[in-house]
Curated annotation (Swiss-Prot):
Belongs to the intron maturase 2 family. MatK subfamily. This is Maturase K. It comes from Nicotiana benthamiana. It comes from the Eukaryota. GO terms for molecular function: RNA binding. InterPro entries: Domain_X, Maturase_MatK, Maturase_MatK_N. Its main location: plastid. One of its GO terms (biological process) is mRNA processing. Disulfide bonds: none annotated. Usually encoded in the trnK tRNA gene intron. Probably assists in splicing its own and other chloroplast group II introns.
């Protein structure tokens, strides 16, 4: 028990001064460049759609002027339009919170760079757009044929703003950083504008998204600490989908209450979870935990997670947010894919002397399919086809030029092929391509006041084929199989790294 407590005891050497560099170092941007976190080398800090219209010199001067004028005492009843120093306080808050978010990201980015560079002899792919969605690729490529049950988990969202502040308490050395964080949360925003749970994943206010995402990711990082801790305690516990993205987090604060829930000897509890076939992945506000264990073992996992989150975060976590499903009898809509385990029957003829036997074998196979019905429903809602899948023209695009119309249809087609390139069966994608191609032809024919046959005969069918099949240079990943044949290479799954920016395909229900 003492060994476990020493393991969970926070390491004070990991703490950092976050606010002091922002206030007292005038050239804080030089600090970022010295650590290799500039725009060309950054892993976590770069966002392609991020509006980077502020400098840390301005942020530092804003803090100095606000302290001199004592503007932190402005009441929350004041309107955001009440200006001081020539600007409104919403602008001040946004600029300072963005600068604060950048500062606190620096040590975490350095830690990730260090963990990635620790793989000696391994070629680790480094991308500045690396996100949690990319951890689902190896998860879907894992062999699920031996697994029996899955836990569908909705990660509990913080019911109080103070929980978000406390998630950083082990990494912060200067208390002024926490005070500034509380000021941002309580002075300018409320919980409803920070995190909403109307969708499977959480949505954030459009203001200071970088700041909010950092807080939420820190909170989720703390929620997942239980899996990393158990993985380190058991050499058999696998976390194949995370690799260097996760590392140990310290949650000693309320672990004693958790121990009292189970038993006096915590090792007995740990023994229950030494599962050699455990697969875990998270994307947005959902988590999936797949195991070869029995229903009793999965029920113990459910009980453990509920009590851990309740004790550690002091929140009421309902057991209804965790569902136990049998993998062979349950299909799930995961990230826009329809994932299921199907049985492939095979018959083997065995002959012994004069007697022959027919042996029926059922082999489990994990499929990631394209959900054709929801996808056609989305196309019908966007007026590309009917609800039955019959292509129709797009009248609102008739005023565009021919090249713009073809480019828009081609972009949608390429995005769909990129997103669902990891599907085990791509026959559905060619049906979607047929719908978009014919819808494009009918839109062009409508614009030129002719029939589809006449338009294609005059322009040539190669025109649409060239635009709809043109590929862009996009980074992708493929996972090698044990057996590689020509047919296997043709049917291999390709995972593109840009799928997180393809519309909202990952969010539709």
């Amino acid at each position: 028990m003492e060994e476990i407590q020493r393991y969970l005891q926070p390491d004070r050497s990991q703490q950092h001064n976050f606010l002091y560099p922002l206030i007292f170092q005038e050239y804080i941007y030089a600090l970022a460049h010295d650590h290799g976190l500039n725009r060309n080398k950054s892993i976590l800090l770069e966002n392609p759609g991020y509006n980077n219209k502020f400098s840390f010199l301005i942020v530092k001067r804003l803090i100095t002027r606000m302290y001199q004028q004592n503007h932190f005492l402005i009441s929350t009843n004041d309107s955001n339009k009440n200006s001081f120093l020539g600007c409104n306080k919403s602008l001040y808050s946004q600029m300072i919170s963005e600068g604060f978010a950048f500062i606190v990201e620096i040590p975490f980015s350095l830690r990730l760079i260090s963990s990635l560079s620790s793989f000696e002899g391994k070629k680790v792919f480094k991308s500045h757009n690396l996100r949690s969605i990319h951890s689902t690729f190896p998860f879907l490529e894992d062999n699920f044929s031996h697994l029996n049950y899955v836990l569908d988990i909705l990660i509990p969202y913080p019911v109080h703003l103070e929980i978000l502040v406390q998630t950083l308490r082990y990494w912060v050395k200067d208390a002024s950083s926490l005070h500034l964080l509380r000021f941002f949360l309580h002075e300018y925003w409320n919980l409803n504008s920070l995190i909403t749970s109307k969708k499977p994943g959480y949505s954030f206010s459009k203001k200071n998204q970088r700041f909010f995402f950092f807080l939420y990711n820190s909170y989720v990082y703390e929620c997942e600490s239980t899996f990393v801790f158990l993985r380190n305690q058991s050499s058999h516990l696998r976390s194949t989908s995370f690799g260097a993205l996760l590392e140990r987090i310290y949650f000693y604060g309320k672990i004693e209450r958790l121990v009292e829930v189970f038993a006096k000897d915590f090792q007995v509890t740990l023994w229950l979870f030494k599962d050699p076939f455990m697969h875990y992945v998270r994307y947005q506000g959902k988590s999936i935990l797949a195991s070869k264990g029995t229903f009793l073992l999965m029920n113990k996992w459910k009980f453990y997670l509920v009590n851990f989150w309740q004790c550690h975060f002091s929140l009421c976590f309902h057991t209804g947010r965790i569902h136990i499903n049998q993998l062979s009898n349950h299909s799930r809509n995961f990230m826009g894919y329809l994932s299921s385990v199907r049985l492939n029957p095979s018959m083997v003829r065995s002959q012994m002397l004069e007697n022959s036997f027919l042996i029926n074998n059922a082999i489990k196979k994990f499929d990631t399919l394209v959900p054709i019905i929801p996808l056609i429903g989305s196309l019908a809602k966007a007026n590309f086809c009917t609800v039955l899948g019959h292509p129709i023209s797009k009248p609102v695009w008739s005023d565009l030029s021919d090249s713009d119309i073809i480019d828009r249809f081609g972009r949608i087609c390429r995005n769909l092929f990129h997103y669902y390139s990891g599907s085990s069966k791509k026959k559905t994608l060619y049906r979607i391509k047929y719908i978009l191609r014919l819808s494009c032809a009918r839109t062009l024919a409508r614009k030129h006041k002719s029939t589809v046959r006449t338009f294609l005969k005059r322009s040539g069918s190669e025109l649409l084929e060239e635009f709809l099949t043109s590929e862009e240079q996009v980074l992708s990943l493929t996972f090698p199989r044990a057996s590689s044949s020509l047919w296997g290479v043709y049917r291999s799954r390709i995972w593109y790294l840009d799928i997180f920016c393809i519309n909202d395909l990952a969010n539709y229900q």
